[in-house]
Amino acid sequence: MIRKGFVMQVNPDCHAEYKKRHDEIFPELVEELKSHGAHHYSIFLDKQRNLLFGYVEIENEQRWNDVAKTAACRKWWAFMRDVMPSNPDNSPVSQELEQVFYLD
């Protein structure tokens, strides 16, 4: 498995809404993520900095990147655009992190 870490931001007044939307995540998005090889996907919130830390294990970089091409993902991005900084294509502004330590 390939471990991926990344950070995003959530708007300061949208913490509860961000969580609520993820509690009610689109079932079709869950299926797309799983079918594209995503496992152990978690997102953590640092409320003081409005920072989101994402962690996911993937089977293959290409399959992971292909999730962004799915209708379910595009629909989710559009749905989330008002609660977080987003790019012109509605994808969340994110920064991939470099792994500097791992303990198995």
Swiss-Prot record:
A cellular-component GO term for this protein: cytoplasm
GO BP terms in the entry: rhamnose catabolic process
Similarity-based family: Belongs to the rhamnose mutarotase family.
NCBIfam families the UniProt entry points to: YiiL_rotase (TIGR02625)
Location of this chain's protein in the cell: Cytoplasm
Chain residues that bind substrate: 18, 41, 76-77
InterPro entries, A to Z: Dimeric_a/b-barrel, L-rhamnose_mutarotase, Rham/fucose_mutarotase
HAMAP family referenced in this protein's UniProt entry, alphabetically: L_rham_rotase (MF_01663)
Native source organism of the sequence: Mannheimia succiniciproducens (strain KCTC 0769BP / MBEL55E)
Record-listed E.C. numbers: 5.1.3.32
This protein's pathway: Carbohydrate metabolism; L-rhamnose metabolism
Role according to the record: Involved in the anomeric conversion of L-rhamnose.
Catalytic activity: alpha-L-rhamnose = beta-L-rhamnose
Keywords: Carbohydrate metabolism, Cytoplasm, Isomerase, Rhamnose metabolism
Complexes and interactors: Homodimer.
Protein name: L-rhamnose mutarotase
GO molecular function terms listed in the Swiss-Prot or TrEMBL record: L-rhamnose mutarotase activity
Catalytic machinery residues: 22 (proton donor)
Gene3D superfamilies named in the record: 3.30.70.100
Domain of life the protein comes from: Bacteria
